[in-house]
Amino acid sequence: MDIFHKSYNVILSPPKVQQADETISKLCDRLEHATLFEDRKAAALGIKSFAREFKELVAAHGLKGIIQSLHRDYDDPELLKVTLETCLILTRHDDDSRASDTGLWIADQFILNQDNIQCLLQSISHKDFYVRLYSVELFSAILSCRPTELKDCLQTFPSAISSIMVPLRDSIEPVRNADLYFLSELVKDCTSIQKLVVFENAFETLFSLLENEGGVDGGIIALEALKFLNVLLKDNISNQNYFRESNHIPSLLKLLSVDTFVDGTWDTSRVQCVIEALYALQSLVPIGLSSSIANQNAVVSNHGIDVLLTLATHPDLLFFDVQKISWITLAHVVYSNARAQNSFVDSTFFDIKNTDVLTCLFDYLFLSSISPSHRYSVAFFLRSLTSENDELSSKFLKQIIHAYTHKQDNRLNIIQGYLDLVHLSDQDQYDNWFTSTILTYLVIDNDQRKYLLCSIPLFQDMDNDEDSESEDKVTFIQCVSTKLIATLRHENALQNCVGYLTLLIALVYGNPDSVKDFLSESSILQTFLTALMDESSSANSVIQGMIAVFLSLVYYYCPIESPVSKSDVYNAITSAVKRDVFINRLQRLRRMNLYEITFLSMKQKMHAIDDAADAFNTKIGEINTLDAFDEAQKQLKSLREEIDNTKEALDLSVKERSIQEEKLNESLKTSKTNLEEQTQLAEKYHEELLDNQQKLYDLRIELDYTKSNCKQMEEEMQVLREGHESEIKDFIEEHSKLTKQLDDIKNQFGIISSKNRDLLSELEKSKSLNNSLAALESKNKKLENDLNLLTEKLNKKNADTESFKNTIREAELSKKALNDNLGNKENIISDLKNKLSEESTRLQELQSQLNQDKNQIETLNERISAAADELSSMESINKNQANELKLAKQKCSNLQEKINFGNKLAKEHTEKISSLEKDLEAATKTASTLSKELKTVKSENDSLKSVSNDDQNKEKSVNNEKFKEVSQALAEANEKLNARDEEIERLKVDIIGLQNASLNMQSLKDSDNRTISDLESKNKELEKKLKEADEYWLLIVEELESKRTKDKELLRQCGQAVSEDEQSEEE
């Protein structure tokens, strides 16, 4: 009954809860150590079930067994599939932004052991579908965890990339797609892997894949393939050349051809694929590289321009990004390539459309229904089309000017609306800005085109040209400046202000004629300064910065014959704006992130100017300010005519005073010749100073190099010092230990020597006993001989017993006596034998003691040999240290040579400086003579003033101009002299620095020499101690060997044998 009750309780009791960590550890142990395949498979399935919830436990306990199963169970696809899937579960992380620690650890376990990567590479080419798929996905997971490490690891295998490329040609789509994703991530930012992939026929594989998928209509797979192609071509010149040489450009252009599309519907997948193909073509022809010229020519020869033009002007793509990227791709194709540019202009596309190039571009550029970014892509293409092609730029500019001058009503007449003051802001707010950018692209860096644009007639009725010949015409620059001033107060047209300023900066840069044209109306300059001074909250930093740049160029390129002189421009700027404020405007423009300033942000910004600028286009007393400006120009003309009449009246007085002027001219010519000579000398001195500066720069570099070498030497010496000190300490400790061992050995040797003495005394006693034994043995032998003779005689007498009885009796009596004597002898012999046995036991004891002494001597010899080895090692260390000290000495000598060379150069510089100072003194003397001559000229001018009152003003002007020229020349000479003085002072400071550096180097050298001498002395003392120790050891060994030989000789004399091994040791 008890049995049934217990079994009933067992059935009804709840089951025990099994812990996960125990189960996982058991399963992992079974997977790792089980011999049966079914056990390992069951364990792998159990581990897989726990892997999702307990990643850390499974990775900690079972990763070794999982990786072992990958190697061991390669032939079984089911178990291999389970293990690969388990690895995938462990490496994948829930958060896509950051890899988990478990995934990183597993990735490290695979990467650190190359056999694991090799196993994965083999499993990629497995027969089973899931094994191939999971292997590729596992590679992708490892790449997401450790990208750089996996790339470096794969490059160590020669056939890794070829193995990875095999699934890309697989007929099963999941495997192929997974491998495509993995490869596209693998080749990013790794040029070497990109080259290896291309050498495995990646281009042919990709194009065949695209063809099978239906080109740009292939969906996501085609998009990924095109992205992969773009990555292979971008920033990789060797792949670009291989792509061109293998004739793949027609295949890429075929993908972009509209005729190959399935239908006319443009869904998002097709648009994305076309855009990615255009990006790939852009990567093939990058801007700014000389290697892209061949690729540009190849695209042109394969009718790529017509294909791209068709996409860029396709009516269905007007509101897609495809059109914008097509114009940018065309810009890549024609940039700085005359052949491509001419082929674009001569394209049959424009003949079919019955239009010219510029009109077609302007149709899209000024189309307000499309976005500004689309329109700017056309402007960017126009810039690339005219880059480094002056002929085409001049042709386009002439077409625009011809349309304006002939008042043509077409797209080319963009200047008319651009300069019209009635419409200060265009309707879509971008036309004037685009016009400014186009004109800037066409005239930049070419003075002829700038003159052509600035010389067009403005604000004139073409029918009344003859009536207006006597009036001054308003120039192009003045009109653009006026339009800019009038536009500043319109908040919705500030992007046009940026365009106007950009064009003005391009016209003024490097062109004094344009600056003269701008300064012909001084009121415009004042209005610009008022805009620059604006400190209100609505002021725009970009516009103020560009105005500051423009005024800087105006001042820099201001010519001598300008209506407003250069000094007046400077005074006007400095009086209106402080220097710090002006620099602040420039710095604010420089700090602006211009890429973030979009058209919309420019539209929302506001700017205000003062009352004069606000009232510029208002009417005052029924008169327009522009008409008042024209009347002011007429008055200026009348004043110029009056000046001409006064000049004719003054010609007579000029002739009378021509003689005096000739004299003055001669004196001025002489002064000019002297100044020219001084300038030539100054140029020579300047060249010499430049050479000296270059030499000083070289010396500074050498000084820096020597300082760095000195620092390295100091560090090395410090390391050597520390090493020597530690080694010396160790040597002293070892020496003390050896001395202690020597003392112990000496004590032991004294004990052994005393024992040897006792042995010698006992051996002498044994010798005497042996001698007595030998004498007794000789006597015994003699007695035995006598006995033998007697026995012979007895035998003879026995034969004659009968006859000699008497003799027998006597013989018997003698025999008894002899027997008595023999008994006594036998007792003596037994006693002697006992004594010999005692002596032999003593000899054995002595021999055992000798063997012990031999063992002690051998241990001492071993210690001596070890000490000798240590001494030899210390000698080798000392030799190495001596070699290092020699090298340090050599480095110090080299540094000393460099310092001597620097001192020589410093001396040469001082000599040149002294010569320059002498030349400066001579130049100051000549300057003083010139000042005296100027004083004489002034006195002559004063005398001429009293001659005539009518001609006084003219003479004053002439003399003042000459005086100004001479004074300017003197000022320039003084400036040059001051500059030379400053350079001389700099040279002196550099020489002082060189001298200080040489002193520092000398002190460092002295300290190094001291340390070297100290180390050498210490080494010598150590060598002496080592020699003394060697001699002492040799003496001890010789004494031990001599005593050992004596002991052996004593043993031989005692009659004991010496082994052959001992004799060989003696030899």
UniProtKB/Swiss-Prot annotation:
Keywords: Coiled coil, Cytoplasm, Cytoplasmic vesicle, Cytoskeleton, Endoplasmic reticulum, Golgi apparatus, Membrane, Protein transport, Repeat, Transport. It is found in: Cytoplasm, Cytoskeleton; Cytoplasmic vesicle membrane; Endoplasmic reticulum membrane; Golgi apparatus membrane. It is a peripheral membrane protein. Pfam families: Uso1_p115_head. One of its GO terms (biological process) is intracellular protein transport. Residues 934-962 are annotated as: Disordered. Residues 934-943, 951-962 have a biased composition (Basic and acidic residues). Its main location: cytoplasm. InterPro entries: ARM-like (IPR011989), ARM-type_fold (IPR016024), Vesicle_P115 (IPR024095), Vesicle_Uso1_P115_head (IPR006953). One of its GO terms (cellular component) is endoplasmic reticulum membrane. ARM repeats lie at residues 51-92, 105-144, 148-188, 191-234, 237-285, 287-313, 343-366, 367-405, 407-446, 484-513, 514-555, 648-688, 770-810, 830-873, 958-997. Residues 623-1034 form a coiled coil. Gene3D superfamilies: 1.10.287.1490, Leucine-rich Repeat Variant (1.25.10.10). Belongs to the VDP/USO1/EDE1 family. Required for protein transport from the ER to the Golgi complex. This is Intracellular protein transport protein uso1. The gene is uso1.
